[in-house]
Amino acid sequence: MEDRQKRLIDEAKALLEQGKVSWVIGYEPGSLKFTTTPLITRDKEDINRLVINPFIINNLSNFLTELEGRVAIVAKGCDSRSIVSLIQDNKVNRDNVVILGLPCTGVIDLAKIEGLVGRERDEIDDITLKDDKVIVTIAGKQREFPTSEVLCDNCLSCEMPTPEEYDILLGQPVKPSPLATPDKLKEMPAEARWQFWQREFNRCIRCYACRSVCPACFCQRCFVEETEPQWLLPIPHWQDNLLFQVARNIHVVGRCTDCGECERDCPVNIPLRSLTREMYGLVDELFQYKAGMDKEAAPFLTAYEVEEAEDLIR
């Protein structure tokens, strides 16, 4: 990890010093223990703050559309898929991006760690990711857990741990080994599932954090802000909250890479990934299409053939 971090710092500094990029986007230590925060800088002195650790959870691709000039960006496998999707939609010019690809074995869900050890983060001395296990140190005593119990849910089903689109690869490639994760919601009767979502969206405060953090949400004006016609009331009733999420999922279908940012960023912990993952699976099943895999491919539902299966368009 330290070797990769040193190389990242060296590469990023060189890119800035040689004038090959105007900006560098990566991760720096967060203000809270065992966290990181995005680092966006054009100052080479800031580059020393760049880190690589098991807590680099943010999908940084969202920032590419906000910066002018050539940008170097640290990208895990899922992040690189989001970048490719933005390239496909002409939201990002590939020539203006230097992708510092980061092979990834998964990032740690701190809430899972706290639940397993029954302690808050401030009571934990150290968390180390090593091969297929995580070592947690508390008061000098170590406890080990398999990664399947502590990684973020989207990491467990990751199909691209190593970016396929990159300019510089930081480390050795990691082979994909997605785990089958049960979907308890799909096993529920339809009525119970409906009641579940009614309860969940009754808690939604309509803060739009899910929209703001999503790389696939890039409309200049969102439908929820329209007043003629007005699609949703500004007061967060559960019916309008549900409509917002259904419409948002339809809008990003074929662009969602299952990065899990929408669910992670939700302040009231609504399991939004259950919705996006369902749409992701349907696109794969019906159209054999996965977002962000090929920058040369046409965006989803923008290319048609005479031989197109008729049962899908009736």
Regions found by a protein language model. Name each.
Residues M1-W197:
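Iron-sulfur-associated redox domains of electron-transfer enzymes in respiratory
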Residues I87-N90, C204, L282:
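Alpha-helix boundary/capping residues
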Residues R81, S212, R273:
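Glycine-centered loop/turn positions within well-structured domains
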Residues L15, G19-S22, N90, C207, ...:
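Short secondary-structure junctions and interdomain/linker hinges
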Residues F145-S148, S212, V246:
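Homeobox/homeodomain signature
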Residues K175-N202, A216-R314:
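Ferredoxin-type iron-sulfur electron-transfer modules in oxidoreductases and energy-metabolism complexes
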Residues C78, C104, C152-C158, C204-C210, ...:
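Disulfide-bonded cysteines in secreted/extracellular proteins and peptides
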Residues I9-D10, Q198, Y208, I250:
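Residue-level marker for well-ordered alpha-helical positions
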